């Protein structure tokens, strides 16, 4: 069966190339391979690469990337899984360190544009939202079985939606009559409750769908796992670069990278005000996040909320 082509623009492509330009990349990990756009650019600019480990939860994306990167088939190794498993995959092939790590946390256009994946409220499809099609939990499971309290909590914590109570209550009342099984079912149910005015910012449906997607895929949990152990495997002079797309992700990345670059450590937990000295393991390449230029946003509106942070491992 031929592999379909999906037009997908890699976000902040030039900035990613620049981020790794000073580094000798012998072993590189792409934690979110997608269609292989970033991979293609990095492999073109770094002929010294001996191993390019590409990880993605979506087997369809891996198939597309494998075809796209055929020119470098002697160097690439593709693994289906979550980016927080990078250390497991490294050890499986006999490696204990890496020179670079890239993670792009955005949902790719090819996933958003496939109605059957259930990521977008603008396209009718099953209420799924699994990055890994083999995962057990779906958005429909959450919407139809979780309590009003738990639904409200994820809408508040993962969507930062002001009307989280109303959204949860509306869903629970509606599902007593009929199950909510499609993206259109959920969107049509919540639209009247929100009465959104386009002049007043983000569509609340965007935030509700974001919250469900984060919950289904445990996105924030695995992001924390990734960043907290990255510097254990990064060689001195190596770099980690993360592209995030909403404040929850960026907050985790910012805090973890700043902690790695800090010479202080809170001894009894966040906010305690009690510190002890520690040796920094990294330096921040950019203290403020890099954002897309107006030209890129115009060409690819989905890039508008991207934030790019980079850190470099210090000598031991």
From Swiss-Prot:
InterPro entries per the UniProt record, alphabetical: RsmH (IPR002903), SAM-dep_MeTrfase_MraW_recog (IPR023397), SAM-dependent_MTases_sf (IPR029063)
Keywords: Cytoplasm, Methyltransferase, rRNA processing, S-adenosyl-L-methionine, Transferase
One matching Pfam family: Methyltransf_5
Tree of life domain: Bacteria
GO CC terms of this entry: cytoplasm
Gene Ontology MF: a single term: rRNA (cytosine-N4-)-methyltransferase activity
Any GO BP: rRNA base methylation
SUPFAM superfamilies reported in the protein's UniProt record: Putative methyltransferase TM0872, insert domain, S-adenosyl-L-methionine-dependent methyltransferases
Chemical reaction(s) catalysed: cytidine(1402) in 16S rRNA + S-adenosyl-L-methionine = N(4)-methylcytidine(1402) in 16S rRNA + S-adenosyl-L-homocysteine + H(+)
Primary site of residence: cytoplasm
UniProt EC number: 2.1.1.199
Residues the entry annotates as binding S-adenosyl-L-methionine: 36-38, 56, 83, 104, 111
Record-linked Gene3D superfamilies: Putative methyltransferase TM0872, insert domain, Vaccinia Virus protein VP39
The keyword rRNA processing belongs to this UniProt entry's keyword annotation: yes
Subcellular location: Cytoplasm
Function per UniProt: Specifically methylates the N4 position of cytidine in position 1402 (C1402) of 16S rRNA.
Sequence similarity: Belongs to the methyltransferase superfamily. RsmH family.
Protein known as: Ribosomal RNA small subunit methyltransferase H
Record organism: Protochlamydia amoebophila (strain UWE25)
Gene giving rise to this polypeptide: rsmH
């Amino acid at each position: 069966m031929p592999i379909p082509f999906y037009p997908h623009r890699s976000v902040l492509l030039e900035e990613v190339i620049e981020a790794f330009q000073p580094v000798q990349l012998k072993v590189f990990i792409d934690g979110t391979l997608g269609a292989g756009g970033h991979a293609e650019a990095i492999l073109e600019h770094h002929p010294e690469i001996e191993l390019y480990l590409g990880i993605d939860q979506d087997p369809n994306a891996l198939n597309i990337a494998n075809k796209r990167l055929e020119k470098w088939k002697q160097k690439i190794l593709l693994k289906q899984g979550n980016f927080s498993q990078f250390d497991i995959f490294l050890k499986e092939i006999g490696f204990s360190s890496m020179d670079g790590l890239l993670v792009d946390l955005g949902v790719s256009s090819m996933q958003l544009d496939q109605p059957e994946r259930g990521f977008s409220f603008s396209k009718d499809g099953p209420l799924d939202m699994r990055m890994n099609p083999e995962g057990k939990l779906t958005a429909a499971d959450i919407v139809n079985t979780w309590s009003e309290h738990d639904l409200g909590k994820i809408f508040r914590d993962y969507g930062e939606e002001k009307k989280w109570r109303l959204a949860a209550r509306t869903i629970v009342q509606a599902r007593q009559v009929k199950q909510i099984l499609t993206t259109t079912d959920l969107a049509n149910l919540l639209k009247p409750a929100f009465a959104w005015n386009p002049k007043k910012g983000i569509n609340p449906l965007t935030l509700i769908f974001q919250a469900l997607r984060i919950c289904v895929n445990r996105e924030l949990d695995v992001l924390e796992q990734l960043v907290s152990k990255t510097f254990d495997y990064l060689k001195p002079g190596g770099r980690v670069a993360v592209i995030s797309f909403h404040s929850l992700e960026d907050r985790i990345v910012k805090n973890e990278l700043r902690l790695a670059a800090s010479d202080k450590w809170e001894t009894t937990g966040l906010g305690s005000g009690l510190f002890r000295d520690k040796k920094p393991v990294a330096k921040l390449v950019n203290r403020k996040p890099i954002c897309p230029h107006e030209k890129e946003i115009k060409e690819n509106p989905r890039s508008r909320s991207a934030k790019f942070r980079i850190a470099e491992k210090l000598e031991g």
